[in-house]
Regions:
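Alpha-helical substrate-binding/gating segment
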Residues: 178-190, 201-228, 249
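A short C-terminal helix-loop "cap" of Rossmann-like NAD(P)-dependent dehydrogenase/epimerase domains
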Residues: 29-31, 122, 149-156, 180-192, ...
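Mid/C-terminal beta-alpha module of Rossmann-like enzyme folds, strongest
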Residues: 180, 217-267, 277-280, 284, ...
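N-terminal Rossmann-like NAD(P)+-binding domain of SDR-like oxidoreductases, especially those catalyzing
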Residues: 1-162, 166, 271, 319-324
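Residue-level signal for the nucleotide or nucleotide-sugar donor/cofactor binding architecture
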Residues: 41, 72, 80-83, 129, ...
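Amphipathic terminal alpha-helices
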Residues: 8, 293-329
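Glycine-rich Rossmann NAD(P)(H)-binding loop
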Residues: 72, 162-169, 191-202, 223-238, ...
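Protein kinase-like catalytic domain
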Residues: 93, 146, 185, 215-219, ...
Length: 329
């Protein structure tokens, strides 16, 4: 919808309805954009889509995005995040129309030693789980294609690294805010694991705007190719417990509905501290997050509140985007 608000002609390529409810269906985006159902692990189907649509810019966001699921099915995670991303880059290499690609990975591509400083784009990549290592691998694949092929073809190519984004319309499993919303709907208690963990909470509109700026820059100037971080403001570091309390307050839910529990028996490792240094984007793209952590949580709460009241969610979402874009005027 953000691209649509700029008047872009859009074609989406994705697996179909990976969650229920589904934002694509809620907003009836099938009436607004072209859509091709497909799996990025299938090179031929992506190649066919690219050849048919002939894009000027590709935004690659497809992924298996859950750390927990990477322990359940590491092969699918790696084949999607590394192998599928390789397929996207191969299509870029072969494309005759493409001018730019923005290749979104994750802040978890960094080898996380849980220090207090934000990670910079030139810090060491790596991971201790299939998800994180798949993202580090996809970054290495990106670097290989950039240096070996895309520069020679004068295709602007940038990798973008963001963290835990929040926002209305997310129904993914094992994510704190969607889990809270499902708990409210089902009237069941929810166990909140690791409430003292910190995450770089930011509203999805902030990094998305960064990606669009990056797409415009690389479209016009290949010098913007390379890696870029898009993290939240450092106004306040929120713990999982902080987020639960704020959402409960906004939606007028008794916070005793949620059971806070340090999960010492989990069979997978998830890092507790991770921050990004975004000085590069601040300096060279003039990009800074427009929303504080509190504003991000409130905006997200407002979206779900409107959904519960059965409002026109296309209009509600559009209004949130319009209000956000005014911050760039």
């Amino acid at each position: 919808m953000l691209l649509n608000s700029f008047g872009s002609k859009i074609c989406g390529f994705s697996l179909y309805e990976t969650s229920k409810p589904n934002l694509y269906r809620i907003l009836k985006l099938n009436k607004k954009i072209n859509f091709i159902k497909g799996d990025i692990r299938d090179l031929n189907s992506i190649q066919t889509a690219v050849n048919k649509f002939k894009p000027d810019i590709i935004f690659h966001l497809a992924a298996q995005s859950l750390v927990k699921d990477s322990y359940i099915d590491p092969h699918f995670t790696i084949s999607t995040n590394a192998g599928g991303s390789n397929n996207i880059l191969e299509c870029c290499r072969l494309s005759k129309s493409l001018k730019s690609i923005v290749y979104i990975t994750s802040d978890k591509c960094y080898e996380n030693v849980e220090w207090i400083w934000g990670y910079r784009e030139n810090d060491k990549l790596g991971g201790y789980d299939a998800y994180s290592s798949s993202k580090a691998a996809s970054e290495n694949i990106f670097s290989a294609y950039l240096e070996s092929f895309l520069k020679q073809k004068k295709i602007g190519a940038a990798s973008a690294r963001a963290g835990n984004v929040i926002g209305g319309g997310d129904w993914s499993k094992d994510r704190i805010i969607p889990d809270i919303i499902r708990s409210i709907s089902s009237k069941k208690k929810l166990v909140i694991r690791n409430p003292s963990s910190t995450r770089p909470w930011q509203h999805v509109l902030d990094p998305l705007m960064g990606y669009i700026i990056l797409g415009m820059k690389t479209f016009r100037n290949n010098d913007y190719s390379g890696a870029w971080n898009f993290g939240p403001s450092n106004d306040k570091v929120f713990t999982v417990k902080d987020v639960v309390n704020q959402i409960s307050k906004n939606l007028k839910i008794n916070k005793n509905k949620f059971l806070l529990k340090n999960n010492k028996t989990a069979n997978f490792k998830e890092a507790r501290l991770l921050k990004l240094n975004c000085d590069k984007a601040n300096e060279y793209l003039n990009w800074k997050p427009k929303l504080t952590s509190t504003e991000s949580i409130n905006l997200t709460s407002d979206w779900y509140k409107s959904y519960f009241y059965k409002k026109d969610m296309f209009t509600e979402t559009q209004n949130q985007i319009k209000k956000y874009l005014k911050k760039y005027e």
